[in-house]
Amino acid sequence: MGEPQQVSALPPPPMQYIKEYTDENIQEGLAPKPPPPIKDSYMMFGNQFQCDDLIIRPLESQGIERLHPMQFDHKKELRKLNMSILINFLDLLDILIRSPGSIKREEKLEDLKLLFVHVHHLINEYRPHQARETLRVMMEVQKRQRLETAERFQKHLERVIEMIQNCLASLPDDLPHSEAGMRVKTEPMDADDSNNCTGQNEHQRENSGHRRDQIIEKDAALCVLIDEMNERP
């Protein structure tokens, strides 16, 4: 009889797969195709599993005796199992002291193993609840972060509005107002308008220099106001 095959807890090194998925192989269509979906059973960590198995399998399906009833309180049963493990461990120590070679030692070890299996099984039954709570907490954190971001944005918006209002209040009353002719006409242009535009080009060129000077004066006045605001304590 050969020696039992050692099963590694880690997957095999991926180098044998990386060499097959080079850029050249992918472009030429020579890269191996993904394996087909598993339909029946598969091996994981040396154990065989069925695809339709439950995530948390019942104890009876694993050939393990159930120590608690079908309807029970998880918290109460976990406390009882914890106390039973402690008592059985003390009994095992007493057996090791009095008669180390007794058969009762193996019985106590099996009892402890069964108790630990039940503890892990009850803890695993809390996994769906733990996943829901983790998702709930994560969504609450995201909601709080978004609300804080919106609040900071609102504060910055109010500050900008206040600064603009202060700038408008600080402007002197004798600044020249923008002329109505500077507004851009957005309506569709007909044939008469296009003819009028050709006649108005020369007049607009004459006024463009004067308007440019006015815009420069306004920019200079705004720069002076901003400098004065920055110098204020």
UniProtKB/Swiss-Prot annotation:
Which compartments does it reside in? Nucleus
| Complex formation | Component of the Mediator complex, which is composed of MED1, MED4, MED6, MED7, MED8, MED9, MED10, MED11, MED12, MED13, MED13L, MED14, MED15, MED16, MED17, MED18, MED19, MED20, MED21, MED22, MED23, MED24, MED25, MED26, MED27, MED29, MED30, MED31, CCNC, CDK8 and CDC2L6/CDK11. The MED12, MED13, CCNC and CDK8 subunits form a distinct module termed the CDK8 module. Mediator containing the CDK8 module is less active than Mediator lacking this module in supporting transcriptional activation.
The record places the cross-link (Glycyl lysine isopeptide (Lys-Gly) (interchain with G-Cter in SUMO1)) at: 185
The family this protein is said to belong to:
Belongs to the Mediator complex subunit 7 family.
Q: Which InterPro entries match?
A: Immune_Mod/Transcr_Coactivator, Med7/Med21-like, Mediatior_Med7, Mediatior_Med7_sf
User: Which cellular component, as a GO term, is one annotated location?
Assistant: mediator complex
Pfam families membership: Med7 (PF05983)
Q: At the top level of its lineage, which domain of life is listed?
A: Eukaryota
Native source organism of the sequence: Homo sapiens (Human)
The name of this protein is: Mediator of RNA polymerase II transcription subunit 7
